[in-house]
Design a protein with these regions (language model features):
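Short coil turns that connect the paired helices of HEAT/ARM alpha-solenoid repeats
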Residues: 35-39, 72-80, 103-111, 134-139
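An N-terminal, globular interaction/scaffold subdomain
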Residues: 38-62, 77-79
Length: 563
């Protein structure tokens, strides 16, 4: 195993990327090596700590089982003490590591370390009840509950700095998600470092050798900021965000081949791309970027809403954050961890009979309008248990239908594992195989064989290759007046309403059964007269942007974009 792995490392190193994370079989072999003396013990230990996926991956199951046995004295290793085992369990996000950590709360000498680990773990889900029950007569479990109630998982993280020096990586014109994550390379999307090599590979005006330029700019010693006039239009690809963050984000301890953080400034940032950046802990800002140039060093002041040229101290752009909650999202390493953590803190405080905490910035929910609600606002309101939701309000509607298609399915699977999802909370989670059915690559064939069981064991529905297209299946299964989501255009609901999302948010909606949403504006479109022979529903859909262009609500030119 070790020889094969080193050979694989060498092949990947030649491409300038890290090796793939360990699978369950490799992890099992690694554990056998760690149980006895070995001359490469540091290398092996690093593999166990840093190169095994977290959450509910099969390899994580093997890793958690071994560490659990170490804590209970059922096995031993010359390189990992019982205390070390608890600390490593604490880096595994959630899922298979939770029960071993709960068990450690009752083991002398390990309970303190286990309490520290659980205090900073957010993906607790149903285990909350076990820990809360235990806290009634176990001081260590009580410490975990108090820590969650005080939001220490959040307050222990460093605040967003008042001033950040960045180096500009600017791509002129409109950058769509196909530029960042090309469709012909869809097969490699789950392998984030490999797929990131395809970023901006299509020749375009104003930029040559983009990846070499990125490496050159990093030598200035500042974080890079991705800058564009119009950023992230087109299909909602989480892979596009993954690629940008792979080149410009921060490493995540104990999570192999994935990064978080980063900065993205755009004259306009497409809404779904903006949300996907938020989810990943990046800092997206819409502002005038006309005075920013490739390689320029700038000072970014998030609280003052100003960006300066670092050499002249001249203000080159001013901005307003879409919401102050963004500052909390960046501090929490992403909107998804913030939502899950905030819910955990709120739930704990409610169970203890405490008032809601004021440590988080909450979305402004004041309803100033006295008008009625649009049909869309009523449907979303129904999913939130209220009469309606105004445009611009933040809400978390219940997801009745969630669709996943096969070119993003493997990425959604990885996100589900990281969310420690062992069962879906949305009523319908459906996986299709319509994109890869006709001409599958070898990697697609493997997906077709492995993904259906993954979806079905969590309570979802999986179609078979050849069963048909995701749209027509969803259309038959939708329930009127309900809300759903799915991978981008695979969410056009003829009844009910849907909001498109990248694969990370699709996984979140499937796991928790709700989805974070800043309610968009409603637009009333009314067709008059009779449908003419030969005119299809697709023609009617295309007539909407055509009419918007004629009325000046939608512009095609890249400068001064109106949407």
């Amino acid at each position: 195993m070790l020889e094969d792995y080193k050979k694989h490392c060498k092949e990947r190193e030649e491409m300038g990327i890290p090796p793939l994370p360990l699978d369950a079989e490799q992890t099992a072999n690694l554990i056998e090596l760690l149980k006895k003396d070995h001359k490469e013990s540091d290398f092996l230990l690093n593999l166990l700590k840093e190169r095994v996926p977290a959450g509910v991956d099969d390899a994580a199951y093997v890793k958690a089982g071994f560490l659990s046995d170490l804590t209970k004295g059922k096995t031993d290793s010359p390189y990992i003490s019982r205390e070390d085992a608890v600390a490593i369990l604490g880096t595994m996000l959630g899922g298979y590591n939770i029960q071993p950590l709960i068990d450690c709360l009752e083991i002398d000498g390990l309970a303190d370390d286990a309490a520290d680990a659980l205090s900073n773990t957010l993906l607790i889900f149903d285990a909350f009840n076990d820990i809360f029950e235990l806290s009634k007569d176990n001081v260590h479990a009580k410490r975990v509950i108090d820590s969650w109630a005080n939001g220490e998982w959040f307050t222990n993280k460093s605040e967003v700095p008042e001033s950040i020096k960045l180096t500009v990586f600017k791509v002129p014109g409109e950058i769509n998600t196909d530029d960042l994550s090309p469709a012909p390379d869809a097969w490699s999307r789950p392998d984030i470092p490999l797929h990131a090599l395809a970023m901006l590979k299509m020749p375009r005006e104003g930029i040559e050798k983009p990846l070499e330029t990125i490496e050159e700019l990093k030598k200035k010693g500042n974080p890079l900021v991705f800058v564009g006039d119009v950023v992230g239009t087109g299909s909602s690809r989480k892979s596009a965000t993954n690629s940008v963050l792979w080149h410009m984000g921060d490493e995540i301890p104990a999570i192999p081949n994935k990064k978080e953080g980063g900065f993205c400034f755009g004259g306009k940032i497409a809404p779904i791309f903006y949300n996907t950046l938020e989810d990943s802990g990046a800092f997206p800002v819409e502002c005038d970027v006309s005075k920013m140039e490739m390689g320029q060093e700038i000072i970014f002041e998030p609280f003052n809403g100003k960006i300066f040229d670092a050499s002249t101290n001249e203000v080159i752009s001013e901005f307003n954050l879409k919401t102050d909650v963004l500052l909390d999202e960046v501090r929490a390493n992403g909107r998804i961890p913030l939502i899950i953590g905030r819910q955990l803190t709120d739930k704990t405080r409610e169970a203890l009979g405490l008032e809601p905490t004021d440590i988080f910035r909450r979305p402004d929910q004041e309803d100033k309008s006295t008008k009625g609600f649009t049909l869309a606002q009523k449907m979303v309101g129904k999913a939130c248990g209220v009469e309606g939701v105004r445009a611009g309000s933040y809400c978390e509607p219940r997801m009745t239908s969630v669709g996943s298609q096969d070119t993003t399915g493997p990425m959604t699977r990885d996100e589900l594992k990281e969310l420690a999802c062992l069962g879906f909370s949305a009523d319908l989670v459906m996986q299709s195989f319509c994109h890869t059915a006709a001409y599958p690559k070898p990697v697609d064939v493997e997906t077709q064989h492995t993904l259906p069981d993954f979806i079905k064991t969590r309570g979802g529905v999986s179609l078979k290759p050849g069963d048909g297209i995701i749209h027509s299946w969803l259309n038959r299964m939708l329930i009127p007046d309900t809300v759903g989501t799915g991978g981008d255009s695979h969410t056009r609901f003829p009844i009910g309403i849907s909001f498109p999302a990248g694969s990370g948010l699709v996984a979140f909606a499937a796991t928790l059964g709700v989805m974070p949403l800043d309610m968009p504006e409603s637009v009333l479109v009314r067709f008059k007269g009779e449908m003419q022979p030969g005119i299809t529903l697709r023609d009617l859909v295309n007539a909407i942007p055509y009419a918007a262009i004629q009325q000046g609500h939608l512009t095609v030119a890249k400068k001064g974009k109106e949407k």
